[in-house]
């Protein structure tokens, strides 16, 4: 059918393994061309955020080199810190449940049960705190999306908010590791 998008979620090749072998993904990129989106679960890309950034960047660069213009979807990443890092690494689509479980505030991700009362007040019902947090988190995610668009058109890290220096330094570390630029970023 041509009226639906097809996404392929790449998983570890062997049962019992919890990491994707990026070399095999890169060697088999041509087999991904029938798909509109390719996806990875965040934690299967590597043991550290930096390892995941490297994996995303290598996949993105190989895809671009092979003219495979397909968005990369990272499952399990939708928070104020890792989402911009993975975006700078070459990922395009993000989703996760953190926005339902935590409060995105003070440029961080905070546990609702303990931080909610300190932000909203100790007399506010926890159900109300949760509802307010969801609304604020949704607005945060929309703002983040707009910030990505501004960054994409200007290249100015300040568009990424108060953590922009952290993102810039992290991106520079990534470039040193992969030995060059990330296409499209």
Model-inferred region functions:
Residues 11, 40-42, 73-77, 95-97:
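Short His-Asn-centered micro-motif
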